[in-house]
Design a protein with these regions (language model features):
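Acidic catalytic loop of the alpha/beta-hydrolase fold
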Residues: 165-170, 199-200
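Short beta-strand element of the alpha/beta-hydrolase
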Residues: 9-21
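Short beta-strand/loop motif that positions the catalytic acidic residue
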Residues: 155, 161-163, 167
Length: 219
């Protein structure tokens, strides 16, 4: 999704890692709408919003249970899915680098599932300038070798975390644990709690904090 009137080498890119519904009962790939998450503000700000069809999501779902593993077999396949997401991410950024309209300012934005289960790609992909996590954190629901807990201390890039105090899906301990574990220097990580539930977060505050963060870490 690109803003109108973009010029050569002018676009920053925000790669979106969506919520759980895109791994369960997603819309058709041509029906994806950034406005569903209220993320159209990214496009209106003059940036491109990149929404890949990750393995296990949208039109690439083979078995929904792999993305929400409950058995040992599904857990084994989920671990493979982690590698698939890393490859999908690298290929997406390679593609952006091959197109003249995009510059090197590339950001990670994860919402819910994308702020919980896919953040390991931040360790393996060094081309991200910064990350924004909406209602994300560390989860104890799956073993450490899969949930990124072992990776988080090795992540050094700037990370903004926006969460709700009344979130019944992602309790306050989850983002606090991730924030404490991040290897990012203290001045380059930020955790904000709003008096809200899981989603939506207060829109005006979310927009202000997000755009300020992206602008702060661009080339």
């Amino acid at each position: 999704f690109k803003p109108k009137g973009s010029n050569f080498n002018s676009l920053d890119s925000v790669i979106l890692y969506p919520g759980a519904n895109y791994y369960r009962t997603p819309p058709g790939i041509d029906e994806v709408n950034p406005g569903e998450y209220g993320l159209d503000f990214i496009i209106k700000s003059g940036r491109a919003l990149i929404w890949p069809a990750y393995k296990g999501s949208m039109n690439r779902i083979s078995d929904m249970n792999i993305s929400f593993p409950r058995t040992q077999d599904h857990m084994r396949l989920f671990r493979q899915l982690l590698s698939n997401w890393t490859v999908d991410t690298s290929r997406t950024i390679d593609f952006l680098g091959s197109r003249e309209e995009f510059n090197s300012n590339i950001y990670y934005v994860g919402m819910s599932y994308g702020g919980l289960y896919t953040t390991h790609v931040l360790l393996f992909e060094k081309r991200f300038k910064a990350a924004v996590l909406y209602v994300g954190g560390l989860t104890p629901n799956i073993p450490p070798m899969s949930d990124g807990k072992n990776h988080v201390p090795r992540m050094k890039l700037p990370v903004l975390m926006l969460n709700g105090k009344q979130d019944y899906l992602v309790p306050e301990s989850a983002p606090r644990s991730m924030y404490a574990a991040l290897g990012t220097p203290e001045e380059d990580k930020k955790l904000i709690f709003y008096d809200s539930g899981h989603w939506p977060l207060p829109r005006n505050q979310m927009i202000r904090e997000t755009l300020s963060w992206l602008e702060k870490y661009k080339n």
